Structure formats: C-alpha cells, structure tokens
Amino acid sequence: MKVIAIAQFGGPEQLKVMDMPEPKPAAGEALVKLEYAGINFIDVYMRSGHYARSHTYQTPLPMTIGMEGGGTVAALGDGVRDLKVGDRVAYCIVRGSYAQYAAVPAWKLVRVPDNVPLPVATALMLQGLTAHYLSHSVFALGPGHTCLVHAAAGGVGQLLVQLARLRGATVIATAGSAEKAAIAKSRGADQVILYRETDFREAVMTITGGKGVDVVYDAVGKDTISRSIRSLRRRGLCVNYGGASGLVQSVEPLELAEAGSVYFTRPHLADYLATAEELQGRAADLFAAYSADQLAVAIDREFPLAEAPAAHAYLEARNTKGKLLLEVPE
C-alpha cells in the first residue's frame, strides 16, 4: 500500500510516498480502508521532531504520519463484536492515517451516522473533539462566561466558537484579516479583534471593562501566550493547546501570580479520550449538533495523498480557513 512517511525529522520535504505492507488487524483491532486523512498541527509537531521526547505521542522513525482518518472497515481482528465489515468509521489519535489502510483499536473507532458525510466526520474527529473537550471539560463554559478564542477562523477555532455559543458563553475572537474576521463572526463570535491592527490584550480589556475573560483558548503559542495570560480575569484560566507560531517552552509561575493568580494548562486530547465512553459521548454530541444544523463544518481544501508536503506547507503558513484533508487513492 501507499503511505506518506518520514525517515528523519524536518520540514515538509521529509514527507515521502513509500510502499509498505498492508497491516493485518490484531486481536481487538479493525482494518480501515481509508478514504480521507485529516491534516493537523500535531502532524507537523511529529514530523518536525517537536514530540521526539513525548510519552503521549511517540514518534519512532521511520514513521507513517497522520493522526486522524475516515473510511470503511475492511477486516476485523479477533474479539471485535461491535463493528462489521463495510461500516463507515472515523477516528483520531492513532498514528499512521496518511495511508491506504490502517489497523486501529476497535474501541477508538466511531461509527459514522448515515446522514453525516465521511469528509465531515473525519474533520470532526481531531479538531471537533478538541473543541469539545476544551469547551466542555478543560473549562466547562456556560451562560455568564466570556472566552477569548485565538485563530477563530481556523479548523478548531470555528468549531470552538460555535460550541462556546451553544453553551451560552460570550465569545471574543481574534483573526488575522478582515476575511477571517468575517468567518469568525459568521460562526457566532460576539466580538472579533484584528490582531495585526490592534493589541488584542488591550482590546479584550476594553471590551470587558477592564475585567478580562474567564478563559483564553490559545493555539497560537509563542507569539501570544504572555498577552493571553494578561487578558484573563482574576483567577482565570489560560489553555494553551497548540503552537502555530512556535511551541511555548515555559511559563514563569510569578507571571501567573502577577496576572491575578491565574491558572495555566497545556492539555493533550488523548487524556480527554481515555475511554470508549468518553470518546463515543463526545463524538455523539458533535454528530447531533451537526445533524441539527447547529454546527457548521468548514472544509478548506482537500489535497491528494501524494501532495502531503504542499498541504503541510499550507497549514504552517497559517492560511487555513477550515479543515484540511488528504484524499486517499483506491
């Protein structure tokens, strides 16, 4: 089968089309014939070596890239009872989705409802589940809360804005252009700050009457994290869940104290999908919201599998206005 793999860490040029044997599902696994693979910043971090020392997301070389996919069940390993060959499924947080086939633990597969297109289901896995755990668990938003969402026109950002509004929160969003601001606004953001024209921290304080927000969801990282911390209300929470501008290497404890005894966390999605019940519950919420026309899923571009290097370059240039997918050939 064809895969996109790396033999060494580095830039997008390290992504190569390779031939690998088709995997055989072990006991408790299902073989998935992939039609789509999601493209995410976690793929960039793994490709570049940022996660080389991670225990949660291990990166042995050589390595087939990709942590999210959608397709149909092609075969079942021993002991798998809840799936059948031909089921449409999607999944995330299993390495190796930039491929024609993947062997996936059966409990990590989500059966896709008939009314949900497979590209949408794939797009809702890593990014949708991220938006869900951020808004429902890391800081459980509700009426009366105000949140700041960075990169609100991106794949996670658009979903996070919508879920926050569904939970009754007020959303302040940041965007890098008028076009992206319009996207964030269309998804329900109450206020949008053009961060290239305005200091977002000053704007947040103006909007909130000097109080700050309850929670900041920051996927930008290095360029924004200090101002994100200082955009919080007293005892607020800064959630750093990505590093589009570079990974955050450290945060000084005194900085948190001086910002108003605020809190800081850097969560992993895997820790919020630790059981089948948690995974299936979050996915069911997302599919239900999509089916009720309460959650719009924007797919920005679909690249052929062989164009994975171009797809990574596009993602890293921070040009995205929604989800990026790879189309996997037959």
Summary of predicted features, one role per range:
Residues 35-36, 76-78, 94, 152, ...:
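Short, surface-exposed secondary-structure boundary micro-motifs
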Residues 70-94:
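A glycine-/small-residue-rich N-terminal strand-loop-strand element
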Residues 84, 88, 122-198:
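Mid-domain Rossmann-like dinucleotide-binding core that forms the NAD(H)/NADP(H) cofactor-binding site
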Residues 93-106:
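A structural motif shared across PLP-dependent enzymes of the aminotransferase-like
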Residues 200-210:
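Short amphipathic alpha-helix with an adjacent loop that forms part of the alpha/beta core around
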Residues 292-301, 309-330:
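C-terminal capping/lid region of NAD(P)-dependent oxidoreductase domains
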